[in-house]
């Protein structure tokens, strides 16, 4: 159970809930075919008022995303339960308007992923050790303009069958985990960015949500108690 609720740009905080489309509930998304897998919302209605802030981000800068169980800004050291193991992922999609509400059909490219390390620790373990914060670098070469940042945690501790993986995601402008868990559960939100800089690259490959993940993907349906290697879902990350 966790929610992406604060962004820092090169160490400078943008304010609590600012620039992020935050759901009221930290319940995860379970259905890979649902449009809620894009930026949350829908089954998890957004916290009102939805932020109209657009976060100014120079290309090449370091983004820090901060996750906590509730949006009341009280549990600032807790992030996600230690038994919720899984990868942490970040995507960007170029958009005409960072405040647009229609997110269907966008072309997303993955620029960050962290999964299972050789020492047996997960991205979520590192998130917990860093008090709910994860850092990633915005590619320095990409075209300037309006973007949505899709930030996601996929809990795969009970993902032996589908639906089981728990998807926690947010778009910059989380989801609660059901206690009877039998599949991967993603949590995601989307943040609203304006990226500046002289870049001209249109990254590829891209993917659309729903569709980027399949129920039989090895990173979605997986028994982590019998793992040798773990494949992070989706396309390779392009920095």
Curated annotation (Swiss-Prot):
List all annotated glycosylation positions.
75, 135, 194, 229
Which cofactors go with this protein? Cu(2+)
Sum up the protein's function in the record's words: Lytic polysaccharide monooxygenase (LPMO) that depolymerizes crystalline and amorphous polysaccharides via the oxidation of scissile alpha- or beta-(1-4)-glycosidic bonds, yielding C1 or C4 oxidation products. Catalysis by LPMOs requires the reduction of the active-site copper from Cu(II) to Cu(I) by a reducing agent and H(2)O(2) or O(2) as a cosubstrate.
Annotated residues that bind Cu(2+) are located at 1, 84, 168
Q: Where would you say this protein principally sits, based on its record?
A: secreted
Q: Which organism is it from?
A: Gloeophyllum trabeum (Brown rot fungus)
Q: How is the cofactor bound?
A: Binds 1 copper ion per subunit.
Q: Which family does it belong to?
A: Belongs to the polysaccharide monooxygenase AA9 family.
The reaction(s) this protein catalyses: [(1->4)-beta-D-glucosyl]n+m + reduced acceptor + O2 = 4-dehydro-beta-D-glucosyl-[(1->4)-beta-D-glucosyl]n-1 + [(1->4)-beta-D-glucosyl]m + acceptor + H2O
> PANTHER family under this entry?
ENDO-BETA-1,4-GLUCANASE D, PUTATIVE (AFU_ORTHOLOGUE AFUA_1G12560)-RELATED
* Gene of this entry: LPMO9C
> What's any one GO cellular component for it?
extracellular region
Question: Pfam families in the record, alphabetically?
Answer: AA9
Q: How is it used?
A: Lignocellulose is the most abundant polymeric composite on Earth and is a recalcitrant but promising renewable substrate for industrial biotechnology applications. Together with cellobiose dehydrogenases (CDHs) an enzymatic system capable of oxidative cellulose cleavage is formed, which increases the efficiency of cellulases and put LPMOs at focus of biofuel research.
InterPro entries per the record? AA9, AA9_LPMO
Q: Does the keyword Acyltransferase apply?
A: no
Location in or out of the cell: Secreted
Query: What are the GO BP annotations of this UniProt entry?
Result: cellulose catabolic process
Cite the source lineage: Eukaryota, Fungi, Dikarya, Basidiomycota, Agaricomycotina
Q: Top enzyme class of this protein?
A: oxidoreductase
As one GO molecular function, the record gives: monooxygenase activity
Question: Would you tell me the protein name for this molecule?
Answer: AA9 family lytic polysaccharide monooxygenase C
Record: residues binding O2: 157, 166
User: Keywords on this record?
Assistant: Carbohydrate metabolism, Cellulose degradation, Copper, Disulfide bond, Glycoprotein, Metal-binding, Monooxygenase, Oxidoreductase, Polysaccharide degradation, Secreted
- Enzyme Commission (EC) number: 1.14.99.56
- Disulfides per UniProt: 39-190
